[in-house]
Amino acid sequence: MASGSGDSVTRRSVASQFFTQEEGPGIDGMTTSERVVDLLNQAALITNDSKITVLKQVQELIINKDPTLLDNFLDEIIAFQADKSIEVRKFVIGFIEEACKRDIELLLKLIANLNMLLRDENVNVVKKAILTMTQLYKVALQWMVKSRVISELQEACWDMVSAMAGDIILLLDSDNDGIRTHAIKFVEGLIVTLSPRMADSEIPRRQEHDISLDRIPRDHPYIQYNVLWEEGKAALEQLLKFMVHPAISSINLTTALGSLANIARQRPMFMSEVIQAYETLHANLPPTLAKSQVSSVRKNLKLHLLSVLKHPASLEFQAQITTLLVDLGTPQAEIARNMPSSKDTRKRPRDDSDSTLKKMKLEPNLGEDDEDKDLEPGPSGTSKASAQISGQSDTDITAEFLQPLLTPDNVANLVLISMVYLPEAMPASFQAIYTPVESAGTEAQIKHLARLMATQMTAAGLGPGVEQTKQCKEEPKEEKVVKTESVLIKRRLSAQGQAISVVGSLSSMSPLEEEAPQAKRRPEPIIPVTQPRLAGAGGRKKIFRLSDVLKPLTDAQVEAMKLGAVKRILRAEKAVACSGAAQVRIKILASLVTQFNSGLKAEVLSFILEDVRARLDLAFAWLYQEYNAYLAAGASGSLDKYEDCLIRLLSGLQEKPDQKDGIFTKVVLEAPLITESALEVVRKYCEDESRTYLGMSTLRDLIFKRPSRQFQYLHVLLDLSSHEKDKVRSQALLFIKRMYEKEQLREYVEKFALNYLQLLVHPNPPSVLFGADKDTEVAAPWTEETVKQCLYLYLALLPQNHKLIHELAAVYTEAIADIKRTVLRVIEQPIRGMGMNSPELLLLVENCPKGAETLVTRCLHSLTDKVPPSPELVKRVRDLYHKRLPDVRFLIPVLNGLEKKEVIQALPKLIKLNPIVVKEVFNRLLGTQHGEGNSALSPLNPGELLIALHNIDSVKCDMKSIIKATNLCFAERNVYTSEVLAVVMQQLMEQSPLPMLLMRTVIQSLTMYPRLGGFVMNILSRLIMKQVWKYPKVWEGFIKCCQRTKPQSFQVILQLPPQQLGAVFDKCPELREPLLAHVRSFTPHQQAHIPNSIMTILEASGKQEPEAKEAPAGPLEEDDLEPLTLAPAPAPRPPQDLIGLRLAQEKALKRQLEEEQKLKPGGVGAPSSSSPSPSPSARPGPPPSEEAMDFREEGPECETPGIFISMDDDSGLTEAALLDSSLEGPLPKETAAGGLTLKEERSPQTLAPVGEDAMKTPSPAAEDAREPEAKGNS
């Protein structure tokens, strides 16, 4: 390198040395061009740090001294981008920046190289590329704006610039701190560039001539104002999100704070967002920061707030900024010094750039799109106007909500609650940032506290602000996404639609070409064809000729040399990559391997598979070279070599254990042609359960990106929908359901599904259901698995296309029984997916095909299993039942939607069905399908259902079925409680004629709930009044009930007429002795009320027993005896009442009073001195008002006989105790002071309605409560 001699020359800079030499006589008389050639040759040979010095001299020569040489030597300098030296690669980036600034047209050639360097593996190279892009983005935008006619190359160049800007924004998430810092500065510049300058924007002196959004005309043919404005706002949003990330580092946070301050000063329209971001950060400092870092961040935040406060546009936000500064410990005097004066605000001059912009603006386009106008921001408006447009933020809304709630009481409560969670010692981080609260309790301090709390709540996703924003943005968000996507389509087109270029391709001549229409050509990086050794002044040497030394070789030598040459080229991978000739090497290898034998191909394939990711370019080059050879051969060409290459690659990739990066998919999608054999490899890849999703994603992309053969690829995916492996099949069905939504594929998918469904009408499974390797000549029977194979796809599509249900019904009618059973088992879930309001499903119910009744019924059951039937569904089923198919099974699913009358009419038919079906019917009516009973939706409540069963005509249904049905009711103990059964018995007893199963129900109820004993006694007494003996079956049950309930039933038996009493003894003679003993335990006064005819029957076979004392009173005639009912326990009894019970009479009051008058003249029944005669005044008070029965309290288990007399005081406790013992009832807690009086009764004309007598009956719950006492007394 000629650098001159002497100290004076050595001390000069590289550039000054060079220019001095050039201005002088020159070294060896070299021209500038020759000098450049010489320096480049030196740089190619130098390996130490002096290479940078030489390259910088070249840069000075061709950029500053003689720019005409720039284009000539561009490729040679760019070749150094593959140099292993980091500094050299950084120099190349700097050279690209300077060259493009000198001649912007060079950006067309160099942008792809810069894009490659942006992805360099070295961090410092990437950082240098980001810094260069910060400048070149503005330069490129200005160039595009000035160009009124945009070429295709310019469009592609700008697309790549925009894509690189997007990539740099993504580097905000890089793992390297330095890269993130550089990305923040790039985003800052991007936001400033893609937003308009305003009247009060602060413009740094070095950026005065930089382009901004306001300099871009609205009618530019390619650059769209609105798109750039949206990109600028999106970049700001990304920066704000990055700043509030909880894991942000200290250096990144400091850089972001400065960038936001710069943005606020240069673009005041973003002042609101910046202040809010500062507030959020102040309230939520990242927890990962150390104590010293917290102090540093707070100091930076304070400095930037003060710088923003100086700006005139900060007037609107002075309250928020001041509060933040006070919290950060800023003195009021310092805040006052940094306040903008109102004079500056009023008299702030307009920037020169604004006036220049006015001159530059073109005439407005009268045909401008209204939609674009709506999106245009007002560049000349103030920050206040922009704030009004943007509306309140989440924090503002939440702060307004909290401010009135921050009363002294509420704040005191919050402090007290939070003290529970305070640590024992003050954290160091809190101590470092704590500043005393000034002006506590003032309106300003309360407002600040509300904003602090609102900021934290918003960061946590809480508060009314977040909720309102979500609601307001739901619909606009969808529209915004659509618009943004349409805006970005043009930019991303090249990236998505780029085709892999074929080396030496003749694809434009091939009719078999499958690729999509050619996308916009992207800029390609410069790759020098030869090594940087250039022919210059010293390059004139004798040309080496191969023919001079060529000697004939044997075939074996030739083969060995070929193999050796290929191996050497393969092994030279790293060396070639450092020299920048990697692409040349790939082309050589692809050409060699295509022309030679399979031995070389196996060697190259093995080399590729060793590191597929790094050598994928070689794989594609080889693949496309084979395809190009096939095309070049024309009509006589064969695909065998291409197919062999593709299958080898795919098979090798399939054997690789880890395919997470999707290389297999990339090879399939970018292969020029997918042959049948290759498609079979893809299919096997899909059948691998560990790679199912990736394989089917590949198939999906083939279907959508290669429309010429999409149905062939779709067929493979459809075949997989009936695969025997669950995971493979499920994944295929998911993909197919998404494709079914596409109109162009819908018909094919549907036809395939219906073809498989139609296979079910065959007597045996067709061979298509079996693999090709299985023998299907012998007819195999249908199995559940083969039936399901035909149904999987159809059932997956059914919820999306309800019309398909009619096809299933048609097939079902023709299928064999085994197939029908499987269909019924698998149809449930898809039918539920259709829903009972599906018009097609309702139509199927309405027009139920003959033979599909079971299918329709199953559908109805599936629909109504957990939800009540809809009115429309009930109407269709009702019409079907009444007009076409009177099969009561149709009604079962919609029972809860029918009228009560309809259910009662259908009951005789329903209970004659299979017991399992009957159980289902009762589960629906009682609401017990899923556990606890809930008949709220049933047309019949439990009581009405049981009554309806009793009322079924035995002609319509046999008694055995009715009894089984009632047993099902009694089995539901949770539903048929004692209260329900009491109401049922009361209503059945009131019916005329009495139901045949009445007494059976009474006995079952008493067995289930023994505490109903008292109530049952009342029922039996009422049945005597209804002359139960006239109903033979009921009478037989009556006697059995009396037999089972003795001795409680003795009081009822005594009410029977003599003839019927004798009949009872005839059927149950064992009742006579206990009943006689019971009567003899009465006092004489009580026995006086027993008619002689009754006593005669009682004593008919008991003459040997001592006769009871006759009552002095005259005997009652049989006709005078009226059946009496149990009376409820009276109001508090007199203390001397030894029996503790009262008489309740159901007949006329007048006749009862007459009986009392007959008994009064007798000696025994006459009152004694201590027993006053009964009188109206001595009677208990009127009975309590009739209320609903309450069985929650236990009552006495038995009652006294319906006929009894008063007793004297001195009768003694022993006799009374004996009477209680015989009745198994409790000893009364209080006895009457005088004789027992009779309760007034209503006349027959005012008998209580149905159920009222039950209300008078003692509570069964009360009986159970007093049972222990009764047992103790007995």
From Swiss-Prot:
Residue ranges, annotated region (Disordered): 335-392, 1102-1137, 1149-1274
Compositionally biased region (Basic and acidic residues): 349-362, 1149-1159, 1263-1274
Any Gene Ontology CC annotation: nuclear body
Placement of HEAT repeats on the sequence: 31-64, 67-101, 104-146, 153-192, 227-266
Keywords: Cell adhesion, Cell junction, Cell membrane, Cytoplasm, Cytoskeleton, Isopeptide bond, Membrane, mRNA processing, Nucleus, Phosphoprotein, Repeat, Tight junction, Ubl conjugation
List of residues that carry Phosphoserine: S13, S494, S1221, S1222, S1243, S1259
Chain positions found as Phosphothreonine: T1257
Tissue and organ expression note: In testis, expressed in polar epithelia and Sertoli cells but not in vascular endothelia. The protein is detected in stomach, duodenum, pancreas, liver, fetal brain, carcinomas, lens-forming cells, fibroblasts, lymphocytes, lymphoma cells, erythroleukemia cells but not in endothelium of vessels, epidermis, intercalated disks, Purkinje fiber cells of the heart and lymph node.
Compositional bias per record (Polar residues), positions renumbered to this chain: 380-392
Residues joined by cross-link Glycyl lysine isopeptide (Lys-Gly) (interchain with G-Cter in SUMO2): K361, K483
The keyword Lyase is assigned to this record: no
Locus of motif Nuclear localization signal: 345-360
UniProt keyword Iron-sulfur, yes or no: no
Function: Scaffold protein that functions as a component of a multimolecular complex involved in histone mRNA 3'-end processing. Specific component of the tight junction (TJ) plaque, but might not be an exclusively junctional component. May have a house-keeping rule. Is involved in pre-mRNA polyadenylation. Enhances SSU72 phosphatase activity.
Subunit organization: Found in a heat-sensitive complex at least composed of several cleavage and polyadenylation specific and cleavage stimulation factors. Interacts with CPSF2, CPSF3 and CSTF2. Interacts (via N-terminus) with HSF1; this interaction is direct and occurs upon heat shock. Interacts with SSU72.
The protein, known as: Symplekin
Lineage: Eukaryota, Metazoa, Chordata, Craniata, Vertebrata
